[in-house]
Every structure is written in C-alpha cells, then in structure tokens.
Amino acid sequence: MRKTARGFTLIELLVVIAIIGILSTLAVVALNSARQKSRDSKRVADVKQITTALELYYADANGYPVAATAVELGTGSQVALCTGGWKAACAMGDTTYMGLVPQKPTPNDGSCNSTSTLPSNMYQYTAADNTTYSITFCLGGAVGDLTAGGHTASPSGIQ
C-alpha cells in the first residue's frame, strides 16, 4: 500500500505567492492615488476656509490685509488672521478671523516646482492694496472643475 503525501507542491506555493504579490502591488497603487486625491481636496478646502476668513476681515476692516511681497501662509508670522492682518498670534482684544491657518499637506504633489512662478506646496498670499488679494496654490490632480497644476483664489473665486 502506498502512502499519499500531504501538503502543497513547490509550484502551487509559488503560484499563490505570485498572486499575493500582484494583489498587494495593486492595493499600494490604489492607496497612493487615494492619498494624493485626499491631499488635493484638503488644499482646496483650506483655500476656501482662508478666503472665508478674508471676507470676514474685509467686512470689518473695509479692506483685505496688505502684503506687498508674497507671503507663505501657515508659517512664521503668517499663522493667524486677526485685527491688523496676518500675525504670528492674535493679541488679547484682537478680533480673530482665523486663529490658525491650515498647514499645507505633504508631500508635494503636482507639476508646480521651485523653477515655476507658482508655489509647489504652499499657500502664497499677495495683496498690493486692500481692494483685492490672490492666494496661489498647486494641485497634483483634478478636484471638481479644477485641473492639476497652479491655481489662484481671489475675491471672485478660485480659477
């Protein structure tokens, strides 16, 4: 009488390992795509939140905060929007329009880079006078009607 061997052959094990490898690769690719879309959605939501705070500031001060040179929002002395404009922190008695500017999501996405006139991964605010402003930012992929690449938010909306 002959005993039958129990277990898997080497070929069967290699096929199963190959299938698991292919499935895990597909899962990682899908996860990275979802992460990029999430970062881009956060960028658009952040810019909308900043523009809302600027409109509240405008209603009280009859103008927008002036920034003759471009400033990176959310860093250094531009982390809060209070009476008098962008500050490192709001003082007692100041009206706070945005207590903490949203931090930019990382890593960088998109085609905007340091050789471009557009910021790669920041919210860049400029306002030559108090009648208008622009916030430039970059998207790595499409979000709604916005395509990948550089965009500008102003009192008239996001283009």
Please report, for each region that a protein language model flagged, where it lies by residue:
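Extracellular/periplasmic head regions of type IV pilus-like filament subunits
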Residues: 55-137
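Short, surface-exposed interaction loops/tails
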Residues: 127-159
